[in-house]
Amino acid sequence: MKFDGLICGDSDLLLKEMLDQNISVDLILTDPPYNLNKDFGNDSDKLSLDDFLLITKKRIDLCKNLLKDDGSIIWFGIHHYIGFIQSIMYEAGLNYRRMNIWYYENGFCRTQKAPLTQYEPFLWFSKSNKKWTYNVDDVRIPYKSTDRLKNPIYYKNSKGEKVKWEPNPLGAMRGDVWAFPTLAGKVFKDERTEHPTQKPESLITEIIKAYCPKSDKGFYEGTILDPFHGSGTLGVCCEKLNSQGHKIKWIGIELEKKWCDVAKDRLDKILTLV
């Protein structure tokens, strides 16, 4: 089998086949089922805790072995289980880099007996403890204020010299809280599908920009794998970037034909515009 683009099938079997073919990837960016009884067309989100953790461990072990030596995993989760998943990553021999937070901006709550849910965590682990990709300048954000320009701040550099702080022309460094709205409301009607946990393209594109390797000329050119491709957001984002001159190879594996069809339809619309 050729592993390139959208593939409809069981990620457990297909990840093993990728290993048999000696395929390796630079980045694994995935949003697997959270085991919250969502309807994905099968029982993958309705498991006992033990079964959920066992399946998660198997997938993470396979993913680790598919990573290049300087590769990274970005794994979305939910606050219920993210601690378990983080422990599984440690046990697999992966190296913790950061727990990032996707801050919804437009969260919701189904109960009056708990705080409003406004975030989902996503873990970043690297295969190596010495080398990984993080494109800091590609994901800078606007400064919140200009107070530092009005009231200059001085600091001592590595030589002990007093230096005036100057703003980076590209913006402030991104923190570990990533603020992007969910796909709610009319403004997102063209992007939104029926998939119950679809992530916004704006968020996934920003993550790709942060963690995908680049060529000497500044183009993204790594190989990205999503073993739980869902409605196809990763593929759509990669193809939109490729239409700008980047050369990202992506592999999206999805079990359910319904979501494969949705992903294919979204991709077809993008590719006809290229």
Model-predicted regions and their roles:
Residues 263-264:
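Conserved SAM-binding loop
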Residues 269-274:
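Positively charged, low-complexity nucleic-acid-binding target-recognition regions
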